[in-house]
Amino acid sequence: MSIIELLKVIFLGIVEGITEWLPISSTGHMILVEEFIQLNASAAFKEMFFVVVQLGAIMAVVLLYFNKLNPFALSKTKREKRETMRIWYKVVVGIIPAGVMGLLFDDWLNEHLYNYWTVAAMLIVYGVLFIIIENRNKHRYAKINSFSELSYSTAFLIGLFQVLSLIPGTSRSGATIIGAIILGTSRYIAAEYSFFMSIPIMFGASAVKLLKFGFNFTSIEIITLVTGMVVAFVVSIIAIRLLMAYIKNNDFKAFGWYRIFLGVVVIGYFLITNGKVLS
């Protein structure tokens, strides 16, 4: 592997680590970055890489929340272990809608919606939604401030919002956070629940892509995958910590404005470059 290719992989890992957890669409950013940074690999490998690199990001959540999510921790009382198991039950309930829809329509969505128009439109639409919802909630208090207050029905409804994230440019975390806030969840719990729901969803998506691609990797492909995942892991730890510290005293409007700005830039760029936005 050349130094240039290694730097490309490192950069892609950084983008994944930042955008996976901020409500700004990791898939949308990866599509856009690929316009400027092309890996020297087959189309099948690149499609698989952009999904499997998320495993590094997911392991950051597992590490940061290991104690909170571990129902077998010796330091926990029986009551705390039961509470931890309830978190997992609510995660399972929440991922059912997106899991089912993803299995049924993943190929169709990739074929028909994996384009710059869709990405730009979803960036702008959800940017506007973030601003509207945060303005509406400015003087409201959250009804759900802990996982014990999160009901199974609310968890399922948040899962329905996550289905929207199957559309490129939406943002899985963005869709679930918006849904959770609309349903009365605090920003902090909304973000954490979004993180926890991502664990089985992204492990499952990565497993599907790996099975489709096969496990017959070249040495260069192995280095590419491992490097991307390690970088995404390290950057994700930093991004998650910064995001959780930020939302303790701030709302998500800044991310809404960023999404609108980026969506407009995307439309402008691809209109200027020979109408590629129509491809």
Curated annotation (Swiss-Prot):
It holds the Pfam family BacA. Keywords: Antibiotic resistance, Cell membrane, Cell shape, Cell wall biogenesis/degradation, Hydrolase, Membrane, Peptidoglycan synthesis, Transmembrane, Transmembrane helix. It is a multi-pass membrane protein. GO terms for biological process: cell wall organization; peptidoglycan biosynthetic process; regulation of cell shape; response to antibiotic. One of its GO terms (molecular function) is undecaprenyl-diphosphatase activity. GO terms for cellular component: plasma membrane. Its EC number is 3.6.1.27. The chain crosses the membrane at residues 3-23, 47-67, 87-107, 113-133, 150-170, 188-208, 220-240, 252-272. It catalyses: di-trans,octa-cis-undecaprenyl diphosphate + H2O = di-trans,octa-cis-undecaprenyl phosphate + phosphate + H(+). It is found in: Cell membrane. Signal peptide: none annotated. Belongs to the UppP family. Catalyzes the dephosphorylation of undecaprenyl diphosphate (UPP). Confers resistance to bacitracin. Bacitracin is thought to be involved in the inhibition of peptidoglycan synthesis by sequestering undecaprenyl diphosphate, thereby reducing the pool of lipid carrier available. PANTHER family: UNDECAPRENYL-DIPHOSPHATASE (PTHR30622:SF3). This is Undecaprenyl-diphosphatase. It comes from Alkaliphilus oremlandii (strain OhILAs).
